[in-house]
Design a protein with these regions (language model features):
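Interface amphipathic segments
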Residues: 13-116, 123-176
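Core structural elements
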Residues: 2-14, 122-123
Length: 176
């Protein structure tokens, strides 16, 4: 049986989640037998987050890594820090901050499952083509569950947006 624990400060890890880096980490690392758990606070790009990362080392784990991330994303950070420089993450659609909870699970076959939940209460949403606006302060949520292979989205298992008087649900299968 093997176990170790350490508290780390000012940690930077390159290319940790989908090619993104974490910096300014204040992390606790625990290793027990064939798994490592990392917990703490860091910046993902310029977005302050709370992170729990589980890494399994065995030969046939159920999953290889799982990242649970929680943070507040300001409107401009979608593009500048997270690389989401496309609709609906642009200033034409989203204005204001969103509270985000994201779980990314990585498997040995290069598959990734992503579940993202956003609290849109403080976010203004604008759908100009539909002449629809959700004002800041009006409750709203968005959720997406998707499956990736490598860096490509293969399946959007489900997505929902419930905000004000708008309710959108769907799924999508991407072509190879």
């Amino acid at each position: 049986k093997v176990s170790a624990s350490s508290q780390l400060k000012e940690v930077a890890i390159a290319d940790i989640i989908g090619g993104m880096d974490i910096v300014k980490g204040e992390l606790i690392v625990e290793v027990v037998n064939e798994a490592m758990t990392v917990r703490g606070d860091a910046d993902l790009g310029a977005v302050p987050i709370s992170l729990t990362w589980r890494r399994n080392f065995g030969d046939t784990p159920v999953f290889r890594s799982r990242y649970q991330i929680q943070g507040r994303v300001e409107q401009e950070q979608w593009a500048t820090s997270l690389g989401f420089d496309f609709a609906p993450f642009t200033g034409e659609t989203i204005r204001g901050p969103s509270e985000a909870k994201v779980t990314v699970t990585e498997f040995d076959d290069r598959r990734r499952e992503v579940r993202a939940k956003l609290d849109l209460t403080e976010t203004q949403l604008l759908l100009a083509d539909l002449k629809w606006i959700k004002s800041q302060g009006v409750p709203g949520t968005a959720q997406v569950d998707l499956t990736m292979h490598g860096d490509r989205v293969r399946v959007i298992d489900q997505f929902t947006v419930e905000a004000g008087n708008l309710e959108v649900r769907g799924s999508a299968q991407m072509e190879s």
